[in-house]
Amino acid sequence: KASVGFKAGVKDYRLTYYTPEYQTKDTDILAAFRVTPQPGVPPEEAGAAVAAESSTGTWTTVWTDGLTSLDRYKGRCYDIEPVPGEESQFIAYVAYPLDLFEEGSVTNLFTSIVGNVFGFKALRALRLEDLRIPPAYSKTFQGPPHGIQVERDKLNKYGRPLLGCTIKPKLGLSAKNYGRAVYECLRGGLDFTKDDENVNSQPFMRWRDRFVFCAEALYKAQAETGEIKGHYLNATAGTCEEMMKRAVFARELGVPIVMHDYLTGGFTANTTLAHYCRDNGLLLHIHRAMHAVIDRQRNHGMHFRVLAKALRMSGGDHIHAGTVVGKLEGERDVTLGFVDLLRDDFIEKDRSRGIFFTQDWVSMPGVLPVASGGIHVWHMPALTEIFGDDSVLQFGGGTLGHPWGNAPGAVANRVALEACVQARNEGRDLAREGNEVIREAAK
C-alpha cells in the first residue's frame, strides 16, 4: 500500500509555527498581536495559529506543502508574554519573511497580516498592536509625496505649527458661500482651510464648483496677506478614475494641496494619488475617517499606530492623529508615540508609549500630524507644548464659532499661536503660564 508520507487530520499549529528559539532577521516584518484565546486554548497554540493563518498555513497538512520550503516562507510565533493586569491576554510576537509580501503594496501587506486571522474560532479577540517594517521593505515604497521639510520650503513657513480650519457646516453650503467662508479664514491669518471628510460631490455642491470658488478665495487671500495659503480640496471619490480627475483639476487650478480619506478610499487609491502628488508638486492631506471602527476596541482590531505607519508608506503629507485635549479619545504618551513614528526618522522601542519595536525609516520623508477635533484657542498652549513645531493645528468650530465671525476667529487663533510660540522661545513654561500668555495676547 502506497504511503503519501504524512498523516491526514487536524494538526496542532504550534508543532510547526511556534518557534521560541527563532532569531529574527533584519529583513523580517515583525508584528505584535494582543491575543485573547478562547478558554482552554493554550497561548502558544493561539499565537501559532495567528502566525500560520496570516502566512503559509492551513488547518491540516496538504500534499502541496511538499512542493515548497515552509521553513523559508512560514510566519513564526517567536515569543509570547502575558499582558500585565489582564486575565488571559497575551502579546504574541510573529516574524514574517520578507518574501511573503509584494513590494510597494500596503494593500498586500494588510491582506496578509490582518486579512483572515481576525475571525478565527480559536481566538476570542485579536488586536494588531504594532508592526516593525524593515528597511528592505520600506525602501520599496515612495512614502509621503513631499514630507515635512519640503512642505515648509514650499509654503515658506518656519518655526511654528501650521494653522488650519475645517469649514462648517460641513454639509449644505453652496459652493459660492463655501468659498466665502474659506476666504474669511485665510484672510484672518490661517495657513489652511479644509474640506470636511464627507464633502465629496453632493447635489448641493458639486466638486468642480467648489474647487473653482475655493481657488478664487485662496488667491484673493494670498494677494491680501502676502502669505502662501492652501485649502485641502477633497479629491476622494467613488472610483479611482474620478479621484484622479479631481486631483488633475486641482493641479490645473494651481492650488498647493489636495486631500484624501485614506481608509474609506482604500490604500490602493491612496498610493495612486500619492504618486501623482509627488510627480505634480501637490501636497497631500490625509483624513482618517473610519479609523475608530478599526482601532477603538482595546482588545480587538488594530492600533492606530499601525494605520499611521501604513499611511507613511502609502503616502501622505499630513494625517489626523488625535488631539490629546479635544473632544475625541487619545492618551498623551501613546498619541505622542505614534506622532513621533510619523515625523521622526528613527524611533526607539518604548513600551510605555506603546512602541513595541524600534523602527528605522531610513530617510523616508515624515508626515505632519494634524490635531483636530474639539480644540479651541484655550488649548493652544497645551497643543504647542505637546505637538511642537512640526504639526498642523486645526480649529473648526474653534475658528468659525467666534461671535464676530470667521476672520476674527482666525485672527484670534493666529495671535494665540504666535504668542505661545514666542513665550516658549523665551523660555516660559506653557503648562503653567499658558492661560496667562493667552490673556496677555488677547489685549
UniProtKB/Swiss-Prot annotation:
It catalyses: 2 (2R)-3-phosphoglycerate + 2 H(+) = D-ribulose 1,5-bisphosphate + CO2 + H2O; D-ribulose 1,5-bisphosphate + O2 = 2-phosphoglycolate + (2R)-3-phosphoglycerate + 2 H(+). The modification N6,N6,N6-trimethyllysine is found at K7. The basic functional RuBisCO is composed of a large chain homodimer in a 'head-to-tail' conformation. In form I RuBisCO this homodimer is arranged in a barrel-like tetramer with the small subunits forming a tetrameric 'cap' on each end of the 'barrel'. Its EC number is 4.1.1.39. Substrate binds at N116, T166, K170, R288, H320, S372. Its cofactor is Mg(2+). InterPro entries: RuBisCO, RuBisCo_large_chain_AS, RuBisCO_lsu_C, RuBisCO_lsu_C_sf, RuBisCO_lsu_fd_N, RuBisCO_lsu_N_sf, RuBisCO_lsuI. This is Ribulose bisphosphate carboxylase large chain. RuBisCO catalyzes two reactions: the carboxylation of D-ribulose 1,5-bisphosphate, the primary event in carbon dioxide fixation, as well as the oxidative fragmentation of the pentose substrate in the photorespiration process. Both reactions occur simultaneously and in competition at the same active site. It comes from Abies mariesii. It is an enzyme of class 4 (lyase). The modification N6-carboxylysine is found at K194. Mg(2+) binds at K194, D196, E197. CDD domains: RuBisCO_large_I (cd08212). The record marks K327 as: Transition state stabilizer. Belongs to the RuBisCO large chain family. Type I subfamily. Pfam families: RuBisCO_large, RuBisCO_large_N.
